[in-house]
A protein has these predicted regions:
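Asparagine-centered strand-capping/turn motif at beta-strand->loop junctions
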Residues: 61-67, 77
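Exposed beta-strand and adjacent loop surfaces of beta-rich binding modules
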Residues: 56, 68-72, 395
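Intrinsically disordered, low-complexity regulatory regions enriched in Ser/Pro/Gly/Thr
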Residues: 20-21, 52-53, 66-67
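A structural motif detector for short, solvent-exposed N-terminal "entry" segments of globular domains
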Residues: 28-62
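Gram-negative bacterial Sec-dependent N-terminal signal peptides
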Residues: 1-26
Length: 483
């Protein structure tokens, strides 16, 4: 974080007490330097790019601090963010943990060559991985969408710090490597030995397709200042989640203004996290050139959507999002798409998505969405919307309009907006501090990237022919609207 942003953060936090916000010496924010207490990996996949060419997703998490840590690792499928696996992970000081998400005959699983402690134990055998499960969307938990294990093949990942492990305790002894291997032998006092965390986690995900000759590496989004309390939960518990943010205060910088906003009295505990992820416009590039047989997919993941959207056929979830989750139709939110080529020409064609969403306007309907251009389907997703274009290269804009008081196009009043409590606003240009009695964030809480592939076929070399395919991942650029 640069010096100006640090100064604005400190000044704004210092003024929050004037709004009656208590315990606000810490507030959740997206750390642009990539370190935090909670990490969100926007996408994993083990789908086939084409038949017989599956992806593997390689995950890493690093503890950069001098304290051992307990963290919750959670995998969520991409349609409705139903949990498919979670476990507790223990990282010793300066530790790294890695794992691979791989395809199985019916779904997906995970294995790790790493010896850091997990409870329950995660398989180290790639031929017999720890399997993802469908318990959270079948039987009494069914959401009227696909109930098969195939649904586990794509989604996203959360890693949430439960806390630091006190030095000199039996738990720290159990997780500390001795000659490269921790004993992992005694977690009986893990809850008592865990205190509030201090962040310092970072991580990466690589989507690799060996047979296609492509990989896409993406950094995890880091939430800093997530909790001032220990968040210990037993293995198998659905806690902690992103709704455990504490205190319920967010810090967001846009332009010269830094907003420190109180969410302590709003209906949903996760609002502070949604606020730091809110964007009203998302931008990125695309390449579809014939010569290089290029393709482009965009990933747009909304990691807090599940906290707002109930299951059912109604179109009036409580706040922020437009529609309930309606089985295989998903939960659709309207979006305006504008296309630009590299020579300033633009196209904005309502209803351009294919297949048409069930709401008859351009919309994204899942929690981990993949938007492909000209059906190039770089990632092989099933949670897919297609944007046709006549441009071979350029950039796109996705706009999420909304208003707290009136309809905005096809978006009803009160949707695509999140209204919080008071804010302290610090302006780095003028050095002044002001206050808002209510604060409106417009847009949707979305993260993601563009995956661009290029295929040059095989090239003859001194050692024989080699495959010359390439892939790159590019984080989205965004704007914010806060009033």
């Amino acid at each position: 974080m640069n010096t100006f942003k640090k100064k604005s953060l400190y000044a704004a936090l210092a003024g929050v007490s004037a709004l009656g916000v208590t315990g606000a010496a810490q507030a959740v924010s997206v750390n642009p330097d990539g370190l935090g207490q909670a990490l969100i990996y926007p996408y994993y996949t083990v789908r086939d790019k084409v038949a017989g060419q599956p992806f593997t997703s390689l995950l890493s998490v690093v503890n950069s601090t001098t304290s051992a840590k307990a963290v919750k690792v959670r995998f969520l499928e991409g349609k409705n963010s139903r949990e498919v696996l979670d476990f507790n992970l223990y990282l010793s000081r300066k530790d790294v943990w890695v794992a691979a998400i791989i395809p199985t005959a019916t779904g997906a699983g995970i294995y790790t060559p790493d010896v850091s402690c997990t409870t329950p134990v995660v398989s180290a055998d790639p031929t017999n991985p720890t399997l993802f499960v469908n318990y959270a969307y079948t039987g009494s938990a069914a959401d009227n969408a696909d109930t098969s294990l195939d649904r586990t093949r794509e989604g996203y990942v959360e890693i949430i710090e439960m806390g630091n492990i006190l030095a000199g305790t039996t738990t720290e002894d159990a997780v500390t490597h001795v000659a490269g291997v921790p004993p992992c032998d005694d977690f009986s006092s893990a809850s008592a030995d865990t205190v509030a965390g201090n962040g310092g986690l970072f991580g990466n995900m690589t989507l690799i397709n060996v047979l296609a000759g492509e990989d896409y590496g993406v950094e995890a989004v880091a939430l800093d200042g997530f909790s001032t309390q220990a968040l210990w939960a037993t293995p198998g518990s659905v806690e902690p989640t992103l709704a455990r943010v504490n205190p319920r205060v967010s810090v967001v910088t846009t332009g010269n203004n830094t907003y420190v906003t109180d969410w302590s009295t709003t209906p949903d505990a996760v609002d502070a996290v949604s606020a730091v992820l809110m964007h009203n416009n998302v931008y990125n590039e695309f390449v579809l050139e014939t010569v290089t047989k290029s393709g482009t997919d965009w990933v747009a993941t909304m990691p807090t959507k599940r906290f707002y959207v109930p299951t059912g056929s109604g179109n009036n979830p409580g706040r922020l999002f437009q529609r309930n989750f309606n089985g295989n139709n998903g939960s659709c939110d309207d979006v305006v798409v504008t296309q630009f080529d590299r020579e300033e020409r633009s196209i904005s064609v309502p209803g351009s998505f294919s297949p048409p969403p069930p709401v008859n306007v351009d919309a994204i309907c899942w929690e981990a969405n993949v938007i492909t251009l000209n059906n190039t389907n770089v990632l092989g997703s099933r949670n897919l919307a297609n944007i046709p274009t006549s441009f071979q290269s350029g950039w796109l804009g996705l706009a999420f309009s909304g208003s707290a008081t009136a309809a905005s196009g096809s978006v009803p009043a009160g949707k695509h907006v999140l209204v919080g409590g008071g804010s302290t606003v610090f302006n780095t240009g003028t050095g002044t501090t002001s206050a808002l009695t209510a604060t409106t964030f417009t847009g949707l809480p979305v993260i993601g990237f563009a995956a661009i592939s290029l295929a040059n076929g095989t090239i003859a070399g001194a050692g024989g022919s080699v495959l010359s395919n390439y892939g790159g991942a590019f984080l989205h650029k965004q704007t914010r609207s806060i009033q």
